[in-house]
Amino acid sequence: MTPAGKRILVMAGGTGGHVFPALAVAKYLAQQGWQVRWLGTADRMEARLVPQYGFDIDFIDIKGVRGNGLIRKLAAPFKVVRSILQAKAVIAEFKPDVVLGMGGFASGPGGVAARLAGIPLVLHEQNAIPGMTNKLLSRIATQVLCAFKNTFTTVKAKVVGNPIRQELIALGAQPKPEADKALKVLVVGGSLGAKVFNDLMPEAVAILSQQQSVTVWHQVGKDNLAGVKAAYQQHGQDGGVNIAEFIDDMEAAYRWADVVLCRAGALTVSELAAVGLPSILVPYPHAVDDHQTRNGQVLVEAGAAFLLPQAILDVNKLAGKLQLLANDRTELARMGQRARDVAVLDATEQVAAVCISLAEKG
């Protein structure tokens, strides 16, 4: 049993792909009696989200430098030094037993500050291709963890999967209900929606509905509701379509769906595996190092997903893939089972166990 009173500083921010896996680990350790504190930046999503889960958060002043202008790049070294000193002050005051970095701007300075203070540093990389921060920090980290095989080529890393919510793991273990006559398509393009899905789905559904009964739950993103609703109506498809700017209850959405049309973010791929759902993946084409394509290959190679590059995606290709799945419900069920077969269901516990072990040694 983990001794109570241990302290962990969690560094994760910027996107849900970093923050939500970190929250899963933080909640697990807090339930074991650990004191959790967060390090992030004040202008990103962690500033709003982390306090809602009851964790204290400290901020440092740091921004990314990839792709920025010359003046900003020249000033970057001085800002990095300042942010390391800010992180060092947080560490000196909190005195963590271990520091966990899970991506985002704050992880870089925080990771360096942890090692300067002689505190064990655990890194977790969610994507199949490591981000710049984790790539650099991996050289000095005490332990490197990753979600997918062959993520790191220059350091030894342990594959542990991506921590996800226990509710989704439990959902995947439940028996699948008998399929309805209508194919139920969940469309998720992230919190901002995906323009390509918003543009293509109304017409694709119109084509599909000529041969097959279909219902759609479509997350369109902020400020896109009216336009997408009008597009479905224009194609005569507003009756079987549920349109939302944002889906708050993804557990309910996954439970409802037969197939998911989505991007291939690391957390999305891990959730699809955990809940055992087949998918049509369209990787975000501007993702750094095209990491979403590599993420999606995990499900594609398992026979659990189709991957359609956005550059070649059109209405007919999308409608064709949906028709293929609608026509063969047995294969659809097999794809869902293959997704579940590649899921790593104890990722949260594995990440926590590494932190616990290092804290006890220290």
From Swiss-Prot:
Family that this chain belongs to: Belongs to the glycosyltransferase 28 family. MurG subfamily.
Biological role stated in the UniProt entry: Cell wall formation. Catalyzes the transfer of a GlcNAc subunit on undecaprenyl-pyrophosphoryl-MurNAc-pentapeptide (lipid intermediate I) to form undecaprenyl-pyrophosphoryl-MurNAc-(pentapeptide)GlcNAc (lipid intermediate II).
Listed CDD domains: GT28_MurG
Annotated InterPro entries: GlcNAc_MurG, Glyco_trans_28_C, GlycoTrans_28_N
NCBIfam families: murG (TIGR01133)
Taxonomic path: Bacteria, Pseudomonadati, Pseudomonadota, Gammaproteobacteria, Alteromonadales
Any Gene Ontology biological process: carbohydrate metabolic process
Biochemical pathway: Cell wall biogenesis; peptidoglycan biosynthesis
Locations listed in the record: Cell inner membrane
Catalytic reaction annotation: di-trans,octa-cis-undecaprenyl diphospho-N-acetyl-alpha-D-muramoyl-L-alanyl-D-glutamyl-meso-2,6-diaminopimeloyl-D-alanyl-D-alanine + UDP-N-acetyl-alpha-D-glucosamine = di-trans,octa-cis-undecaprenyl diphospho-[N-acetyl-alpha-D-glucosaminyl-(1->4)]-N-acetyl-alpha-D-muramoyl-L-alanyl-D-glutamyl-meso-2,6-diaminopimeloyl-D-alanyl-D-alanine + UDP + H(+)
Annotated disulfide bonds: none
Keywords: Cell cycle, Cell division, Cell inner membrane, Cell membrane, Cell shape, Cell wall biogenesis/degradation, Glycosyltransferase, Membrane, Peptidoglycan synthesis, Transferase
UniProt GO cellular component terms: plasma membrane
Cell inner membrane in keyword set: yes
Binding positions (UDP-N-acetyl-alpha-D-glucosamine): 15-17, 127, 165, 191, 247, 266-271, 292
Mode of membrane association: Peripheral membrane protein
PANTHER family: GLYCOSYLTRANSFERASE, UDP-N-ACETYLGLUCOSAMINE--N-ACETYLMURAMYL-(PENTAPEPTIDE) PYROPHOSPHORYL-UNDECAPRENOL N-ACETYLGLUCOSAMINE TRANSFERASE 1
Protein name as annotated: UDP-N-acetylglucosamine--N-acetylmuramyl-(pentapeptide) pyrophosphoryl-undecaprenol N-acetylglucosamine transferase
A GO term for molecular function: UDP-N-acetyl-D-glucosamine:N-acetylmuramoyl-L-alanyl-D-glutamyl-meso-2,6-diaminopimelyl-D-alanyl-D-alanine-diphosphoundecaprenol 4-beta-N-acetylglucosaminlytransferase activity
